[in-house]
Amino acid sequence: MSIKVFEVLSDMNIGGAGKLLLTRMSLSDKEKFDEQVIIPRGSLLEDEFRNIGYSPVFMKYCKDRSFDIREIINLCKLFKKEAPDIVNAHGCLSARIAAYLARVPVRIYTRHCAFKPSIYMTYRPVKSAIRYFSKLFSTKIIAVADAAKKNLTDVGIDPQMIEVIINGVVAVERYSDEKNRRVRKELGIPEKAFVCGICARLEDAKGIDTLIRAARVLLRSNKDYYFMIVGTGSLKYYLKELTDALGISSRVKFCGFQKDITPYLNCFDVNINCSRGTETSSLALSEGMSIGLPCIASDWGGNPYMVKDGYNGMIYPTDDFISLADCISRIRDDRELYKTLSHNAILRYEDELTALKMTRKTEKLYEELFLTASQRAEEEAVAK
């Protein structure tokens, strides 16, 4: 008999959590698990899940929000009717509460982000309340990085409740030299340019301005650098204006949102992450590692776990654009260092960051929690 699992996600757009869930469900063991996904009506994720063979169930109220009492009522009715063995709520508090009220045996909360807790959340009474309700509503918590786990324990959650399962991605296609040259030409990249790339939302937490300021420092002494920014967001016009103001717009290309970043990653010589908030384990960094791209990342959140300084890339102090520029120039100027970092990037990816490893670890946890819950139910039945 297969284990019935409901995955609940409140995202309206296709973000990191949605991509991870799509990847994992596409690789899941269909003989062992009967999975269903619940998303908001109108979410851009609907077609993506249909493309991998799932017909989503829709929420009405939790659209890019974690809590709505009306959704608790709706989900509670659904869970009582369908009787899932496991509910995994990807940040959706309403789903956790509904699963508790519906007496779902295994209730999981997956934490996809990391951020500095507000001061009031560190007060002892608040931490005690968070600890209590976390145990009440959740059987287990999955953190997608050590940084996410620390974030949770900092606000009082019992570390024994938390299982760290690092984000994994499917390896991207590595282009041949001939195809790479053709794609670089099609994208308008100057010949012999050293391409520094970043794939991220254009929001403050992603620190794109740090890369732009580092670009100005580098271009003062060497015009061979070229910068590609893949993504869109609310800071698009501000960042373009900053690039113009610094006089480097001819060497910085804003590529916009790209559903498939494979061509861009293949054009990069180095893959950069400038996060100053929320980062746990960057999917773009992992995808770049799968084709041997050295990484340069800020020391924020989960970046230092993914990027081992001097092994598969370099770590610089968050927001320090001078240090970022120095890391870029060192990797560019030292070909032996570049080759070593590139080789180790692939090893780092294969060691822990593959989609299949993430999927199998999650399924193993599901099976263990299901077995424990089943044994507990049998013991309670005998006791009665």
Predicted stretch roles:
Residues 1-384:
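Membrane-interface segments of envelope glycosyltransferases acting on lipid-linked substrates or membrane lipids
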